Curated annotation (Swiss-Prot):
Lineage: superkingdom: Eukaryota
Functional summary from the UniProt entry: Salivary tick protein that downregulates host immune system by binding to both dendritic cells, and CD4(+) T cells. Specifically binds to the CD4 coreceptor on T cells. This interaction prevents the activation of the Src kinase, Lck, and its downstream substrate Zap-70, and results in deficient activation of PLCgamma1, the repression of calcium fluxes triggered by T-cell antigen receptor (TCR) ligation, and a subsequent reduction in interleukin-2 production.
Similarity annotation: Belongs to the salp15 family.
Signal sequence bounds: 1-15
Gene name of the encoded protein: salp15
Native source species: Ixodes pacificus (Western black-legged tick)
Name of protein: Salivary protein 15 Ipac-1
UniProtKB keywords: Glycoprotein, Secreted, Signal
Induction context: By feeding. By the presence of Borrelia burgdorferi.
A single cellular component GO annotation: extracellular region
Region (CD4-binding): 106-125
Family annotation (InterPro entries): Salp15 (IPR021971)
Length: 125
């Protein structure tokens, strides 16, 4: 009986190691394909990736003479009510810039061209 239990435990352990190796190899395959970016923009933004690219370009243009090669935006720091976004240049320099006038800022077709009609956080969205 002890021999059967020991063989069973080795079988379970071998299966777990095999499953772990398979999971690790699929993870590595995903990493080589590139990381999937998840943008958390409101639903009234029709193409989040396009907007993020445009904002990153604005951010880079603003600091084109900077020696730092690090430029980033953060979708959590977009203020659709005031039509601004946070641009990060390196670990210690942040700048608030204006969103382009054509940027949607509300669910009813509002744009940053008329900031008085823009809405902030929409409850339930």
């Amino acid at each position: 009986m002890k021999v059967v239990c020991i063989i069973l435990l080795f079988g379970i352990a071998a299966a777990n190691v095999s499953a772990t190796n398979k999971a690790g190899s699929s993870k590595n395959a995903k990493d080589t394909e590139g990381k999937k970016e998840i943008l958390r923009f409101p639903r009234f933004i029709p193409n989040p990736k396009e907007l993020a690219t445009k904002l990153l370009d604005i951010c880079k243009e603003h600091e084109k003479d900077s020696p730092s090669s690090y430029t980033a935006i953060n979708d959590k720091h977009l203020d659709f009510k005031n039509c601004t976004f946070l641009c990060k240049h390196g670990p210690h320099k942040n700048v608030t810039l204006a969103l382009p006038e054509e940027t949607p800022c509300g669910p009813s077709g509002q744009t940053c061209a008329d900031k008085s009609k823009c809405v902030g956080h929409i409850p339930g969205c």
